[in-house]
Amino acid sequence: MLITDEMIPDSIAAMEADSKKVVVYRPRSLVVGMGCRKGVPVEELDQLLTDTFQSHGLALESIGCIATAEIKRDEPGILELADRYGVAVRCFGVDELNGMFDENGGNPPNPPLRKGGEDFVRLARDPSSAPHRLLGVWGVSEPAALLASGAVELLVAKERSARATVAVARTVFG
């Protein structure tokens, strides 16, 4: 039995080809933070998502939820994408999202959290003036992924298409 939210390694695929039975369990451990312009079709959002997961070796079957800004709660493309993957949409307000940045859109001055002997700061790393100008938030995909997952770091930092952004964090269990 293999428990993973990553793509199946070639060695496991080779075992299956040799008629050895392998059970793969996909925990719903990945949180997708997503932001987009109004009216972006589900196909465009799904392409960004699948390209991002493939380039980082992640399994789409392990998506636990899609996190976004409260203002995107009724965005058709995001709702259709969540339905396509059978997951919920979690929404966060302006104050929650901006709480991941300092008041100028930069990193907050709090001390870093300790993890594995290295310093990590629980915050989004790539503030953007575009969503701040339009929605009043410094970013959507990175802070939403961190907030929904409870993680202290992103698994995949913000990636962009022409009209959308995506970031991924792994859910903290226990």
Regions of interest found by a model, annotated:
Residues M1-K72, T171:
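Conserved mixed alpha/beta catalytic, RNA-binding, or beta-rich assembly cores of soluble enzyme
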Residues T4-E16, V22-Y25, S141-G174:
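C-terminal edge-of-domain segments
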Residues P41, E70-R73, P131-L135, K158:
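Catalytic cores of large soluble enzymes that bind and process phosphate-bearing ligands
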Residues S55-H56, I78-L79, R125:
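Exposed, flexible binding/inhibitory loops of compact, secreted disulfide-stabilized domains
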Residues I71-Y85:
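Short glycine/threonine-rich loop-to-helix capping motif typified by GTGT followed
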Residues A88-F101:
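A conserved beta-strand->alpha-helix junction
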Residues N104-D119, R125:
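Intrinsic disorder/low-complexity segments
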Residues D119-A144, L155:
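A polyampholytic, Gly/Pro-enriched intrinsically disordered region
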